[in-house]
Amino acid sequence: MAYCASRFHTVRRRTVAVKVGAVGIGGANPLRLQSMTTSDTQDVDLTVRQCIALAEVGCEIVRITAPNVPAAKCLGSIREKFTAAGFGAVPLVADIHFLPSAAMEAVEHVEKVRVNPGNYADKKRFAAREYTDAEYDRELQRLNDTFSPLVRRCRELGRSLRIGTNHGSLSDRIMNRFGDTPLGMVESALEFVRIAETHGCHDLVLSMKASNPKVMIQAYRLLVERMDAAHRPYPLHLGVTEAGDGEDGRIKGAIGIGTLLLDGLGDTIRVSLTEDSVYEIPVARAIADKAMSLWGSTPPPAEDLRLDRDPVVAINPGSWDPVDPLHFSRRETTTLQFSDRCAAGPEQPPRVVVRVPGVHDLAQTAAGFAAASMDETPAEGWLLSIPDAETLLELQRILSKLAQLPVADGRARPVGAPGTPDDPAVRIRQADSRGSIGAGALPGGFLALELAQSITIGDLARFEPAVCGSLVVCRWFDASTAAELTAWAGFVRASGHFLAIDTRPEEIPALADTLRALGDDRLLFTVSRLKNHAVGAHALGAYRALAGQLLLAGSRAPIWIRNTAANAVRDDSGYLGRLIESSFLTGGLLCDGLGDLVSVETETDPVRATKLAYNLLQGAGARISKAEFVACPSCGRTLFDLQSTTQRIRAKTGHLKGVKIAIMGCIVNGPGEMADADFGYVGGAPGKINLYVGRDCVQHNLPQADADDRLIALIKEHGRWMEPPAPIGTA
């Protein structure tokens, strides 16, 4: 059973429509935007002001925590005052953990109740034990007895329910039988779905949240596969939990949410950020608009889709997709050694290529990288567009000048070891204002030339890149140029270069015989532009199809992911739009195990483009270049200022490459939600912090004023600390 109609074009999943007050989710409704208040729910006036602020920036559904019965009672006053302020059509949702009594009070006042199936009727003991079938059945009966009263009351009042699983807060029962896995997340939700259905309750929305986008994506896909096989086309609420703040938080959210939206899944979204919640809505709006632009027409209305009908109508039945969408594994590829310090292949991290604006900008660009702090985020390939043969000759002159090549014998100045006078980075920093020294030897990288079709093999044969080493020659090929492909492949092999074949997946069958004859040892593939932007077409699908066609052709050549304006779902001028587009494409492919090189060519500032590429790699879990922070969005349960705390801890520990630190406002988003974090900083009581190593709490009730230093001491104790590097120019 497929989890979506197509992985190559966006076809919206058919669902029943669920009403949350006056707002419809799923069916023919648009994507709905959600967020959550951060105030203490018992501070009614402040909570109402936050609800109003969210509604005014476009939030369509507002969630409020109800951690106990007194807080749940306050939802009545909040609803009344919010309605009196003119927002009666904006529904409120109660967020419930642990206390069924709070849920029973909350359902009297709000349009929807969200329950976390991992802790609604269970207390976490993190106990390893085997459950017999009889014991498991007794646990399910206990769950039924606890959850059924809420379901019945929801039906009586016309309320809807969200069954919202979180990866890190699965019950001991689920953990011991299914593990801390996407399957465990799905089973956790389905336990509650089955109970709701026994009472005739079908006003259900489901979610599968995790801080790891790969886990989140796999869980939603598995959930849909299981639900649709059982004819349960309930709507989905999408979100990446504990994504953090700033660019990293936006990237994680866009990767997880965007990948699923392009798969056609999702009916309502929240971009969780450790920031004021009003800042979540513009990001969610931008993501939703891009996704909805791919919907050719609205799906059938709710009355045309019954729970006993198959909601999936598959298209592209002849397409071959080599990816297992439910289990991550990286595509097997041939290794290409571009330089002594840079290779692409299955044992290598995805490599970062940066576009240089023009040949005359090469020196300035390289000098800019030397001046910036880029040791952990270097440009590993330098991409230049070559529109004609004259530009190629001009590049030759520039490289010769920059490398200070002696004219007499053509020998290049040697590339020295780091710190020596011939170290390229040293030479770049010593460059004069005209950039006359240094960029000829590109530090640790290779030169990629995107050639116009008018440039011939003869033109390139006259090009002597001197100290640049092997070139990656990027050129367009299609079914009409198979003979040219053979000639170009022969030339690059004889010259020690590499050929990046820019094409579209539909061209590969016509080139297959040629590719089999050529072998993979000098080839890589890319898609720089879609054939057209037909309804539902997107570059993510094109690259997936490319991987499938290469498999059919017997090719294991690496794939270069190029984020270009021609590949965008919608070409936006703003940085947020470019970030979202690159998260959709690069993040989605990396989470499927596809991609060996990455370039973000929509960002014109090379340093910024490179940093964005590395942030994309980190967000997708494909390459780690800095510390990672798992930080929950604030809510009424939070016991300290999450925003300032996250920023403060990042400033002190952000240089710790490969260390993952969870910053959680309270226990509900604490040890369970941290998943695979190395260290945790969790609110234990007002003004008190608990520190964790993994899931284990090792220090309790520390004064918040001391907690930062104690966290650093804990990191040192476990051998993960290093001193931050000195700023450039101070060493």
Where on the chain are the PLM-derived regions?
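N-terminal amphipathic alpha-helix/helix-capping segment at the start of soluble metabolic enzymes
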Residues: 1-35, 151, 155-157, 293-362, ...
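Conserved, mostly hydrophobic/aromatic
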Residues: 33, 95, 163, 206, ...
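Catalytic alpha/beta core domains of metabolic enzymes, predominantly
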Residues: 131-147, 151-152, 172-327, 332-333, ...
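Beta-strand/loop-dominated core regions that host nucleotide or nucleotide-derived cofactor-binding catalytic loops
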Residues: 686-689, 696-721
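Active-site beta->alpha loop and helix N-cap motifs at the rims of alpha/beta catalytic domains
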Residues: 6-7, 12, 44, 55, ...
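N-terminal glycine-rich anion-binding loops that anchor highly charged ligand groups
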Residues: 18-34, 39-58, 62, 68-70, ...
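Glycine-rich phosphate-binding active-site loops on the catalytic face of alpha/beta enzymes
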Residues: 58-63, 110-127, 262-278, 381-384, ...
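C-terminal accessory/binding modules appended to enzymatic or scaffolding proteins
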Residues: 340-372, 641-685
